[in-house]
Amino acid sequence: MQDFLNFAAEVFEVDPSEIDETTSLNEFYKWGSLMHLKLIMEIEEKYEVDIPLDDAAKIKSLKDLYSYIQAS
């Protein structure tokens, strides 16, 4: 999980100490539809998973995203 949180912090350009698995994606100051798409694309590349847009729209927190990756 920590590796994932470090990766998410890098994508969002924040310090890893500022986030944890309960962090909502809406908490990021740069959050918007383009950032959501960027995050999904980065996750798909790094973790070699496919996240359909319907599923991506349901992901609301880092924990949701991590759980999705683990289930894939």
Describe the residue ranges of each PLM region.
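Generic signal for short, ordered secondary-structure residues
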Residues: F4-F7, T22, E44
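Phosphopantetheine-attachment site and its flanking helix in carrier
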Residues: E27-E45
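Thiotemplate assembly-line natural product biosynthesis machinery
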Residues: M1-S17, A71-S72
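C-terminal structural segments of small proteins and small subunits
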Residues: I40-S72
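Phosphopantetheine carrier-protein modules
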Residues: V11-K30, Y47-K58
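Generic non-transmembrane alpha-helix signal with a bias for helix starts/N-cap capping motifs
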Residues: M1-Q2, L37, L62
